[in-house]
Amino acid sequence: MQTGHPADGVYFGLMSGTSMDGVDGVAVRFEAGKPPAVLSEAFVGFADTLRDALFALQQPGDDEIEREALAANALAARYAVCCHELLRTAGLSPDDVRALGVHGQTVRHRPERGYTRQLNNAALLAELTRIDVIADFRSRDVAAGGQGAPLVPAFHATVFGSPDETRVVCNLGGISNITILPAGGGPQGEGHARNDTVRGHDCGPANALIDAWVERHLKQPFDDGGRFAARGTVDETLLAALLDEPYFRQNAPKSTGRDLFNADWLDAKLAGFQHLAPENVQATLTALTAATVADEIARHAGDCRAVYVCGGGARNPVLLDALATALAARGLDAAVATTAALGVPPQQVESLAFAWLAYRFNARAPGNVSTVTGAAGERVLGALYPR
């Protein structure tokens, strides 16, 4: 893109991840040749009734079409609340915003069967906000034979690369994923070529299982500060059983989700371990996340010198310490920090990425990295719902 590209302007990005606790939003200004400038951020939580409906839709059931449509409407309403909060805090009107990039809520991800489903009523969202909505980013990559995930590596390469060191950006959301940014890149300001050696894929479960277990036993939505895990001790026999999962042995490109790593998967793995105290299981689930991420980094980025964490797991110091320990145990001399050290608060990274993907859509520029997803080539991602 040239400086002063007509796609330049203010964009909103909304992301509700596999933790399903709510939607994160950012208002950001993109200009060709400059780093993104965040104007405001917001978080809007989901009511328990909506969370329950979304969890239920992840498993086959009766009357799914009706339940899916109603949940999509409810999501659009919450997304609109987040947008209105961004407008208020940034001092903007809808006419000031070029477009809103919204991920939607993943309820099924089956790229091997040729589809992925991110729930949202984008038409309703456009009506409620009077902002152009760009949605459905993953399906074009899947149509081109890709995994449809992860989609954030192109954004990571633009913002977090370094000319001097190999970096890994690790998202610890419901599912963990990594982006490997080889040395020689660098924060590039939109409009510059991406580093074609960027790689990335999903590693395995993160908060999806950690949150599910603490909610089951403490009736809390997440393990605040990792305190529940800190009370326990890792059970190495259980950890070995959890690691005995074919997905962990698959080669990249690969992606996963709650379709695989859910409460049923965990309960099946826990058969024979009923004697363990709940806090010991929690400690072991935390170790599982650290081990699977560290294994993938050791396998694909042995020269990594820094791991920058984003997502909800960035607020869990016990998990971050476990990751640092797991990396060292595999012979990696890599510091672990959050993306705040690079100037981007960890809770903003994914919503920023989807604002950036909306910007790419308006520029009719590719949003995927085909070497990451396995797609036949780079594609313009998303579909437009005009205001």
From Swiss-Prot:
It catalyses: 1,6-anhydro-N-acetyl-beta-muramate + ATP + H2O = N-acetyl-D-muramate 6-phosphate + ADP + H(+). The keyword Nucleotide-binding applies. One of its GO terms (molecular function) is phosphotransferase activity, alcohol group as acceptor. Pathway: Amino-sugar metabolism; 1,6-anhydro-N-acetylmuramate degradation; Cell wall biogenesis; peptidoglycan recycling. InterPro entries: Anhydro_N_Ac-Mur_kinase (IPR005338), ATPase_NBD (IPR043129). Its EC number is 2.7.1.170. ATP binds at G17, T18, S19, M20, D21, G22, V23, D24. One of its GO terms (biological process) is peptidoglycan turnover. Belongs to the anhydro-N-acetylmuramic acid kinase family. HAMAP family: AnhMurNAc_kinase (MF_01270). PANTHER family: ANHYDRO-N-ACETYLMURAMIC ACID KINASE. Catalyzes the specific phosphorylation of 1,6-anhydro-N-acetylmuramic acid (anhMurNAc) with the simultaneous cleavage of the 1,6-anhydro ring, generating MurNAc-6-P. Is required for the utilization of anhMurNAc either imported from the medium or derived from its own cell wall murein, and thus plays a role in cell wall recycling. This is Anhydro-N-acetylmuramic acid kinase. It comes from Burkholderia pseudomallei (strain 1710b). The gene is anmK.
